[in-house]
From Swiss-Prot:
<keyword id="KW-0067">ATP-binding</keyword>
<dbReference type="Pfam" id="PF01634">
    <property type="entry name" value="HisG"/>
</dbReference>
<dbReference type="InterPro" id="IPR001348">
    <property type="entry name" value="ATP_PRibTrfase_HisG"/>
</dbReference>
<keyword id="KW-0808">Transferase</keyword>
<keyword id="KW-0479">Metal-binding</keyword>
<dbReference type="GO" id="GO:0000287">
    <property type="term" value="F:magnesium ion binding"/>
</dbReference>
<keyword id="KW-0460">Magnesium</keyword>
<dbReference type="GO" id="GO:0005737">
    <property type="term" value="C:cytoplasm"/>
</dbReference>
<dbReference type="GO" id="GO:0000105">
    <property type="term" value="P:L-histidine biosynthetic process"/>
</dbReference>
<keyword id="KW-0328">Glycosyltransferase</keyword>
<dbReference type="GO" id="GO:0003879">
    <property type="term" value="F:ATP phosphoribosyltransferase activity"/>
</dbReference>
<keyword id="KW-0963">Cytoplasm</keyword>
<keyword id="KW-0368">Histidine biosynthesis</keyword>
<keyword id="KW-0028">Amino-acid biosynthesis</keyword>
<comment type="similarity">
    <text>Belongs to the ATP phosphoribosyltransferase family. Long subfamily.</text>
</comment>
<dbReference type="GO" id="GO:0005524">
    <property type="term" value="F:ATP binding"/>
</dbReference>
<dbReference type="InterPro" id="IPR013820">
    <property type="entry name" value="ATP_PRibTrfase_cat"/>
</dbReference>
Length: 325
């Protein structure tokens, strides 16, 4: 029996909803044939694919171990969980959801502390004054150590946080924190501020590939099909389709259209009296339509694109280069 291709997807909440919607837009419908509470699923129409519904943190761990081929998880968890991440996994595509910034935040009462250099001064004076190191509450232990080392800060110790990290300074459990934030509102509500240069990582949900997975020829072909769907949808999302008939259309006009509007003619110059098809960025639709009518078009129709399939599969080409022969 062929070993299944395993795609790991977040098991609950907005991440799962967004992941399901992302694959659905790409024409890949995730299904749970044995019921909504099952933690295994399939992709409709793709044989030998197993969907593993896991927590985002467990997905990162299983990618590291090679137990899944592809997975959706946050870059913050990839960088925190996987040592030498760029050698062991590949961030194939940012998915446009699950945004979070990993930041260094200190009490607002520290009015003279605005940068990591200021924090270094505080760390040194804190140890002299209190005969102990200042405490940093976080669940991002590895990211914190790396970032603080880059800034030459050594006089601190990490207090591991399981949750509600932003409350640690107020409770006396730590002097400052490293945590995720989107708007900064929760930090402010807890009397904290982000340092001016305290942005450690801008994270979002990513489609990630594991180098250590069993990449048989069958697994690579499955990945090719999945990534072709995703790339086709991504191409379509960038353009609208413009169709018209022109009394005269030549290569010079198409070059002008591409140069001024970023619009492409995927099928080239039409024959005399034929329909010209263009793919145009949405922001340039009206100016392009104005030009086409000025050049003799009686009607210009504009429609949405579901998928734009091309011979190229850039996502899979990058994966192949990462995996090697």
């Amino acid at each position: 029996m062929t070993t299944p291709f395993v795609l790991a997807v977040p098991s609950k909440g907005r991440l799962q909803e967004n992941a399901d919607a992302f694959f659905g837009r790409a024409g890949l419908t995730l299904a749970k044939p044995r019921g909504a509470r099952d933690y295994r699923g399939t992709i409709t129409g793709l044989d030998n694919v197993e969907i593993a519904y896991l927590s985002a943190s467990e997905i990162a761990a299983q990618l590291a171990r090679g137990q899944v081929h592809l997975g959706i998880t946050g870059e913050d968890l990839v960088r925190e969980t996987i040592a030498d991440a760029d050698k062991r996994v590949m961030l194939i595509e940012g998915l446009g959801f699950g945004y979070a910034n990993v930041v260094v935040a200190v009490p607002q009462a520290w009015i003279d502390v605005r940068t990591m250099a200021d924090l270094d001064d505080v760390a040194t004076s804190f140890r002299v004054k209190h005969n102990r190191r200042m405490r940093v509450a976080t669940k991002y232990i590895n990211l914190t150590r790396h970032f603080f080392a880059l800034h030459g800060i050594v006089d601190y110790r990490i207090v591991e946080s399981a949750g509600a990290t932003e409350g640690a300074p107020a409770s006396g459990a730590a002097e400052l924190i490293v945590d995720i934030t989107t708007t900064g509102a929760t930090l402010a509500a807890n009397g904290l501020k982000m340092l001016d240069d305290g942005m450690m990582l801008r994270s979002q949900a990513n489609l990630v590939a594991s180098r250590a997975a069993d990449w048989t020829p069958e697994a690579r072909e499955t990945a090719r099909v999945i990534l072709d769907h995703i790339a086709s949808r991504a191409r379509a999302a960038k353009y609208k389709e413009v169709r018209t008939c022109l009394p005269g259309c030549d290569a010079a006009l198409l070059s002008e259209i591409e140069q001024h509007f970023g619009a492409l003619a995927p099928f080239g110059t039409p024959p005399a009296g034929g329909i010209l098809t263009l793919h145009c960025p949405p922001a340039q639709l009206y100016p392009l339509g104005t030009l086409l009518r000025a050049r003799g078009a009686e009607t210009v129709s504009i429609g949405s694109l579901d998928y734009v399939m091309a011979r190229d599969n850039p996502l899979f080409s990058r994966l192949e280069a990462f995996l090697g022969a």
